[in-house]
Regions:
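Conserved GNAT-fold acetyl-CoA-binding loop/helix
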Residues: 29-49
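Conserved acetyl-CoA-binding loop-helix of GNAT-fold acetyltransferases
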Residues: 109, 115-128, 151-155
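Conserved acyl-donor/pantetheine-binding loop and adjacent beta-alpha core of acyl/acetyltransferases
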Residues: 73-106
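Conserved beta-strand-loop-alpha-helix junction that forms the acyl-donor binding cleft
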Residues: 114, 140-150
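Conserved GNAT acetyl-CoA-binding A-motif
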Residues: 130-142
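A short beta-loop-alpha structural element at the N-terminal edge
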Residues: 9-23
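Conserved beta-hairpin
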Residues: 58-72
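Conserved catalytic-core motifs of GNAT/GCN5-like acyltransferases
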Residues: 141, 154-173
Length: 178
């Protein structure tokens, strides 16, 4: 399940990767805090969430030249938070009980590598992975103050479909057909 784009690829995260993954996410948390954003400022994500992702085989790492530079959870079993959408509708009719979509959560890139287009590369690789797993679309959500993701997602062909509600509030919901 590994794809490569020159010397960059993705693979399932392993237990041995947990500290590196957590350092990447801590860097993202700090970037968001310094930018005055609310997202990821209330103890989520945390090392326990990363461990659960790895144990459930949904943690994915992006690797460049044998170095982990990105992380996300790629979920293909549905997300109940996506069963209800406000101010719009999904492009597909799939829901968490008959899931035919993938979901990207907790995506982060090593903060020292910001501005190199790695988030877009990572998403492209995840889109291809989702295709290979038989998904008909990919869904992702982000906070209203995550300016980078709100810019990147439409640029990459994602359609804003509406608002979903997660534990800590509403999120802009996007979907791309595969």
């Amino acid at each position: 399940m590994t794809q490569k784009s020159s010397d960059t690829g993705i693979r399932l995260a392993q237990t041995a990767d947990a500290d590196t993954i957590w350092n990447i996410l801590k860097g993202e948390i700090e970037v968001m805090r310094q930018a005055g954003r609310d997202q990821w400022q209330k103890g989520y994500p945390n090392p326990e969430v990363v461990a659960a992702d790895i144990a459930a085989h949904r943690g994915m790492v992006m690797v460049c030249d044998d170095t982990i530079v990105g992380y996300c959870a790629l979920i293909t079993t549905g997300d109940p938070c996506y069963d209800n959408i406000w101010d719009g509708q999904w492009l597909t009719t799939s829901n968490s009980s008959n899931c035919r979509y993938s979901v990207v959560h907790r995506i982060g890139i090593d903060a020292s590598l910001t501005g190199q287009g790695l988030a877009q590369q990572f998403l492209k690789l995840l889109l291809e992975e989702s295709r290979q797993r038989g998904c008909e679309s990919m869904r992702i959500d982000t906070n209203e103050d995550n300016v980078q993701m709100l810019h990147i997602l439409p640029k990459m062909g994602f359609t804003r479909c509406g608002i979903v509600r997660v534990e800590d509030g509403p999120r802009h919901a996007f979907e791309q057909l595969l």
